[in-house]
From Swiss-Prot:
HAMAP family: Ribosomal_uS2_B. Belongs to the universal ribosomal protein uS2 family. Keywords: Ribonucleoprotein, Ribosomal protein. The gene is rpsB. It comes from Limosilactobacillus fermentum (strain NBRC 3956 / LMG 18251) (Lactobacillus fermentum). One of its GO terms (cellular component) is cytosolic small ribosomal subunit. This is Small ribosomal subunit protein uS2. SUPFAM superfamilies: Ribosomal protein S2. Signal peptide: none annotated. It comes from the Bacteria. InterPro entries: Ribosomal_uS2, Ribosomal_uS2_bac/mit/plastid, Ribosomal_uS2_CS, Ribosomal_uS2_flav_dom_sf. The lineage of its organism: Bacteria, Bacillati, Bacillota, Bacilli, Lactobacillales. Residues 224-259 are annotated as: Disordered. GO terms for molecular function: structural constituent of ribosome. Residues 238-248 have a biased composition (Acidic residues).
Amino acid sequence: MPVVSMKQLLEAGVHFGHQTRRWNPKMKPFIFTERNGIYIIDLQKTVKMIDTAYNYVKDVAADGGVVLFVGTKKQAQDSIEEEATRAGQYYVNHRWLGGTLTNWKTIQSRISRLKELKKMAEDGTFDRLPKKEVAVLTKQREKLERFLGGIEDMPRIPDVLYIVDPHKEQIAVKEAQKLHIPIVAMVDTNTDPDDIDVIIPSNDDAIRAVRLITAKMADAVIEGKQGEDDQQVAPAEDVAEEVSDESLQDLKNSVEGND
């Protein structure tokens, strides 16, 4: 069985791409058709590529790898934090700070400062300081927490990045490429897929689509960490046979507005 069914993808709106005037021609192989100026993503391919991404992330986790979930757009922030936390991994869901990967030592110093400020708030140090100074330190702590809280306990540079909308997260993509860190990403029709190692063709603007696929990547981490190989994902060829006829008809009906 595939990790995600065609029905789940349709219900989450994964098939809706961007307007045709805002496309990247390199995404053409993953486009099913066009409707009312919107590209419709080929979900038959998405089903198979989610399986590939799932197995990839699962294998990284099984080897003790670190997975960093990245998504700073509003539609992704909650899912990124919740699913990364559920999987026992790390996340960036607000602004990506330049150098997060390529200048990790500096980032670690800021994380140390965050931990220091947290300790000061907990051990009563703030109670002995002037109110104005406490206000300044509290504001500093909140800012650091916002940007670094999701990687506060990350032990090292991650082994893989999972990104929602790499078109928006270009700095993260470039840093990962510079350090040869593989990227798994939800890639919409306006994005260059060549920058991504394992792509998942998908609507990256719909909250339900982001939540569905991000949750599956978290599931992959959890399964990998548990070493549960008894629930193997079906090979891509078998998946194609399972979804090709009936599910493609569902997609056509959805695109054409039929019941």
